[in-house]
């Protein structure tokens, strides 16, 4: 049987003389490049670009696109990432010429519509957070973390307080300690207890007058709401420290509880997880931060302000601001999508988002926990962490094998081996946009995988052009450009 396979690289499809278009002959006499461009500015030889027809190029990229997994085509239970479906109307609205044709160097008087939208978004995000002021500048969730910690640092410097430490749970996202370090703090780890919650005894032992903040994700990364958050906030405030809430899991509590009401003093949002910003692709992104009034003077300048006459302006008169963290107004395209999502859902809709996210996660957990036990909690919030430890011990089937084999069933793998406090972790987050039927199919597939021949699973996926690349080698010795040598192929 012969099968027409598309070569993996355009360079391998190249044929001399092949072209995407044939142009008519020119009646302008040809001149050598050397006669028009100084020799020192010319390359010694033409670039080795592939020679292809238009069909070759279109077919190549179409085949690549069908090899990708996406939320539009596949169930995508990638825990801690909230890979929910983003309404296409928000994409259409974000492409309106009235938005895309504007330029940040325009006079503010010609940007009143955009500034009004951004000002209203600031107010929406402040209300959802239960906090007082918002900056839209940060360009990603991680930069939002860093910005908020820089704000905290400026606040304590203004108070002449030398605070050098940030407390971080051992189940936290890796960006938390990285952001603390970049902001000039020492990251101090707080252990989890047997329930998967903050070990309060360890927290109390490490809380002192050098602590600037405690970074808590609530619900946390094992999918549990930590009811100790009120006591944690009280103890921090008694010591003059701040409670930082990582907003990565806001999808679980929208409209049900506000971080400010839990005692949080500052937080960041991830619009790509909660408010229909695009996922991945290297950006652009957004990571707005919300803070209490005492921290508001230190927010990045400018903020969008509304004057008494109803006009909007950029407020640069902020002498205690930490300064800019992003050019212009932030990534307005992503912020506009967030605005559209919040507007279209309304308060009741946002609460329903959280309710359905929690319902779906709990339903799916009950379907799979006898195959892959869930070590923490009888119930969960928006996600849960199952463990393939028993399968690995008894049958040699590891979390990675399960994740890879799911791809053969057109299901994206869950997050594996995170958080580190769960051995053979499978972090599963179905989100609110999936139907019951999808969850039940996932559970059936997981059960089938658990009964398969382990030797066959070790080579999965079997349906992809490449099964298991050497990920360690790729991380240690990445090849970032093609040069035609065999090891690059």
Regions found by a protein language model. Give the residues of each.
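Non-catalytic terminal extensions of PLP-dependent enzymes
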Residues: 1-133, 257, 307-329, 335, ...
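Single, functionally critical "micro-switch" positions that shape active/binding sites
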Residues: 78, 140, 245
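Conserved PLP-enzyme active-site core in the AAT-like
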Residues: 113, 143-309, 396-397, 424
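A short, small-residue-rich loop immediately preceding and capping a beta-strand
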Residues: 132-138, 165-168
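General small-molecule cofactor/ligand-binding pocket signal
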Residues: 135, 188-190, 414
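Short strand-loop junctions, especially beta-strand C-caps/beta-turns
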Residues: 139, 193, 217-219, 387-391, ...
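Short, well-ordered loop/turn and helix-capping segments at boundaries between secondary-structure elements
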Residues: 154, 158, 182, 209, ...
